[in-house]
Amino acid sequence: MMRKLAVTLALASTALATPALARDNAWYVGVEGGAMIVEDINFDIGAATSAGTVDHNYGWDVGGVIGYDLGGFRIEADVSYRRATVDGYRSTVTTPARTAAGALVNFPAGNYDYAGGSSSALSFMVNGLLDFGEDDGIQGFIGGGVGVSRVKADYGLNDNGSFLDDSDTVFAWQVLAGLRQPISDNIDVTLKYRFFNADNVKLVDVTGRNFDGRFRSHSILGGITFNFGEPPAPPPPPPPVE
């Protein structure tokens, strides 16, 4: 009787120790999207420090990932695009801009609450993520990544034409944290926070003046991930020979 009880407990403990949804040594692909806040962009204009500031409305952030789960640590590549429209522009120097008719006019320093246009960033990143928690339950993760980003600015004053329409490709980095939850043997849903930073963005306005600044954003993203290619689970151990 005691031997049978010991065998039963051994088999039960083996089953409990083996995750129902093993993600170790598996590939995954995913898509994600959500809302974004862009920090005010302060531009050095020519020799004038912090001479122009761009305010933004709420924006959006979408992307896709492909990665590999090493067991407790994941490495992945992601491509993402984020964009927000301009809510206002203020400058301590004059702003040359083209009118709707195409004429070039110098607008005085001041606040332009109805400035238009958008800021955007397309990025290609490589990330490393640390996982904590069980594969078959809610699992947390934290990590970061580095890569390159193409930052684009397209700004206009009021109903007039553009005063800045340029882009630059720069080094970028990001910090990531979130949760993931399996909903089937191969599919997870995710909730992620992303802090994204692209420094040393150098742009040129319609008259050739340099605009130097940075792009920073905060995003909350929902996503779905498909896991595939995991090795088959090992067979259960044979029962002890009585």
Cite the ranges covered by each PLM segment.
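Outer-membrane beta-barrel translocator domains and adjoining extracellular loop/strand segments
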Residues: 41-49, 87-94, 152-161, 201-209
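Short glycine/proline- and aromatic-enriched beta-strand/turn motifs that initiate or cap beta-hairpins
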Residues: 20-67, 153, 223-227
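Predominantly the C-terminal beta-signal and adjacent terminal strand-loop region
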Residues: 98, 103, 184-241
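Outer-membrane beta-barrel biogenesis signature
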Residues: 5-30, 229-242
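Outer-envelope beta-barrel architecture signal
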Residues: 23-29, 71-73, 136-140, 169, ...
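Residues that define the transmembrane beta-barrel architecture of outer-membrane proteins
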Residues: 37, 56-62, 118-124, 167-173, ...
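Gram-negative (and chloroplast) outer-membrane scaffold detector with strong preference
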Residues: 65-157, 221-228
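Outer-membrane beta-barrel proteins
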Residues: 13-20, 70-72, 129-134, 181-185, ...
